[in-house]
């Protein structure tokens, strides 16, 4: 999240899989990623469909259930402190420097967040 020690246009590809939703200073990370990515480079991102019906249900029957059983604590405070950036916020920040080349939805290949768990994107720098 701080300035990276790489020169401008250094990387052919940057990969951020289940990372961007956790970063407290998302705008700086996105800006730095755009600075160090080569002009024809690829920024590959995967984010959870946080808040969607499918994601919420999947969490209830998996991570939340396991967390509550193991720690005997409420799960909401934990996940809210971990997933601080929602998909709309991430899309907004990405759109300042990148354009979406391709978008993938998982597990249902329909362009709707409510029925999916994750969104994958191939992005390129705006020209």
Where are these regions (language model features)?
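Short acidic donor-binding/metal-coordinating loop in glycosyltransferase active sites
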Residues: 1, 19, 33
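Short, well-ordered turn and helix-capping elements at secondary-structure junctions
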Residues: 1-2, 107
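A short acidic, Gly/Pro-enriched loop at the edge of an enzyme's catalytic core
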Residues: 2-14
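S-adenosyl-L-methionine-dependent methyltransferase catalytic module, highlighting the catalytic core
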Residues: 24-38, 42-126
């Amino acid at each position: 999240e701080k300035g990276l020690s790489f020169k401008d246009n250094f990387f052919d590809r940057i990969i951020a899989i289940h990372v961007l939703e956790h970063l407290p200073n998302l705008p700086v990370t996105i800006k730095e990623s755009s600075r160090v990515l080569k002009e024809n480079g690829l920024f590959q991102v995967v984010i959870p469909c946080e808040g969607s019906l499918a994601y919420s249900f999947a969490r209830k029957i998996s991570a939340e259930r396991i967390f509550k059983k193991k720690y005997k604590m409420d799960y909401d405070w934990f996940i809210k402190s971990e997933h601080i950036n929602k998909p709309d916020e991430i899309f907004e920040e990405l759109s300042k420097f990148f354009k979406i080349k391709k978008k993938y939805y998982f597990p249902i290949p329909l362009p709707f967040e409510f029925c999916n768990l994750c969104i994958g994107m191939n992005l390129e720098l705006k020209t």
